[in-house]
A protein has these predicted regions:
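Extracytoplasmic "Venus flytrap"/periplasmic binding protein-like
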Residues: 66-131, 164-166, 264-265, 275-276, ...
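Extracytoplasmic/periplasmic substrate-recognition and gating elements
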Residues: 165, 238-242, 277-339
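Periplasmic solute-binding protein
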Residues: 110-115, 133-170, 198-218, 300-308, ...
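Conserved N-terminal structural module of periplasmic/extracytoplasmic solute-binding proteins
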Residues: 2-107, 292, 314, 318, ...
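Long, aromatic- and glycine/proline-rich binding clefts that accommodate carbohydrate-like moieties
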Residues: 337-387
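Glycine-centered hinge/linker elements that transmit conformational signals in sensory
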Residues: 182-186, 219-247
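Hinge/lid segment of periplasmic solute-binding proteins
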Residues: 104-152, 179-180, 187, 206, ...
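Conserved C-terminal helix/tail region of periplasmic/extracytoplasmic solute-binding proteins
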Residues: 2, 163-164, 368-418
């Protein structure tokens, strides 16, 4: 456990970054009356779901959990970026919410800044949580929250396009069979695969299944395995299996390309399930294959329920009740269904599949998934991701070979993470 003095120093540094971000974006206010220092009986919860108003099932759940714990819950929903900034500022003012729900890559940032308690400190039971999902919130062997659920990536396919090309999606089990399928699709006069390779975190998110699926590691971007993954993508563009638009595609615009009906495959996430039903064509979903076969580890998305540090540690007893209520099996099932997430425990995953067998492939993908900040990368991850997306942008645009692009990326990442 880092010393209090060092934690406060890191917190001040993190707040400085947050303040700079606020000045560039939307501006921040201290909102000194809305944090943890509230009257006895009032507990605050901050979440990244501003789309849910007080009449929503989500807010009703928060209220019910408070009532069951004998307290009144005061809830505020923020946009994800704004939430991180406000959490850092509130911690500096000793005014943190009692429960903070944040995107999983943010957990390491807040934990490193000394903002969060460990699950051991608050006595939150994480024994039933899938270890690969819990890992996104583990730093230095300690857990700093519990996942509310997870989303990840897989391959959607257009059955009509594959049928016309004579491709059985069940035969797509590795990179060789996937590329062979794309060849047949192109020969049949259709489009192969669309994805997002934009120069942002979205692009890295979409590249990681191929990178990890080759056996590469984020601590060595220019390994032979990493080069193989980037070569797969560049070869697809060279051969016309993927469009040049992937360089600027977000996950949303990539989906729009697939929804137009001409592409055989699209790499996208669980959050597109509702939209898939609206496409007007028969679709299916298969896991993203690893190079040698099997399901590739895809990155996890989704939020963690965390407990910020409070000067009055007696509050943790109620905080534990709130967290336990929000993540209980019945409540997790309802919340994950609303958010199009896969649950974080085997028991709830089995219930999800029993209710909707279309989720089977997503459960398989989540079981193989991996947190971007896992392997104790923590706050180093963003310093690795940016050189990585710079590398695949360079290689896909033809300004550098995959090997040279990743060599440059490794040099940059190594210097940034010393």
């Amino acid at each position: 456990m880092p010393s209090f003095r060092n934690s406060r120093r890191r917190l001040r540094a993190a707040v400085a970054v947050a303040l700079a971000t606020c000045l560039v974006t939307t501006g921040c206010s201290s909102e000194s009356g809305s944090g943890g220092a509230t009257p006895t009986g009032d507990y605050t919860i901050w979440d990244p779901y501003p789309q849910f108003d007080d009449s929503s099932a989500w807010v009703r759940l928060l209220t019910t959990c408070g009532t069951d714990a004998g307290v009144t819950v005061e809830r505020t929903g923020y946009d994800t970026t704004d939430l991180t900034n406000k959490a850092l500022l509130a911690a500096q003012q000793d005014n943190s919410p009692d429960v903070l729900i944040v995107d999983n890559p943010v957990v390491s940032t807040l934990a490193d800044a000394g903002v969060l308690t460990t699950t051991d400190e608050v006595k939150v039971d994480v024994a039933a949580v899938s270890p690969n999902l819990l890992a996104a919130g583990r730093i230095g062997g300690k857990s700093y929250g519990i996942p509310i659920g997870a989303n990840t990536l897989a391959l959607y396919y257009n059955k009509k396009v594959l049928d016309a090309a004579g491709v059985d999606p069940a035969t797509v089990t590795d990179w060789t069979s996937l590329t062979a399928a794309l060849t047949k699709v192109k020969t049949a006069g259709k489009k192969g695969i669309t994805f997002s390779a934009i120069g942002t975190e979205e692009g890295s998110f979409q590249f990681l299944p191929w990178f990890w699926g080759a056996g590469a590691n984020l601590t060595q971007l220019d390994s032979a395995q990493g080069v193989a993954a980037l070569t797969l993508w560049t070869d697809w563009l060279k051969n016309g299996y993927a469009p040049n638009s992937v360089l600027n595609n977000t996950q949303t615009t990539s989906w729009q390309e697939f929804a137009a009906g001409d592409f055989a495959f699209a790499e996208n996430g669980t959050w597109q399930l509702a939209n898939a039903k609206k496409t007007g064509f028969e679709y299916g979903i298969i896991p993203i294959p690893s190079q040698a076969g099997g399901t590739a580890p895809a990155p996890t998305g989704g939020e963690f329920v965390t407990a910020p540090v409070q000067s009055d540690t007696a509050r943790y007893a109620v905080t534990e009740k709130l967290v336990a209520c929000l993540t209980s099996a019945d409540n997790a099932l309802a919340t994950d269904t609303t958010l199009s997430y896969i649950a974080a425990t085997d028991a709830v995953q089995r219930t999800q599949v029993a209710d909707d067998d279309e989720l089977t492939v997503w459960v398989e993908a989540v079981k193989a998934a991996k947190g971007r900040t896992s392997d104790d990368l923590g706050t180093k991850y963003p310093k690795i991701s940016q050189p990585l997306w710079t590398a695949f942008q360079a290689a896909l645009s033809g300004s550098a070979s995959p090997a040279d692009a990743l060599k440059t990326a490794q040099t940059t990442a190594a210097a940034a993470t010393k």
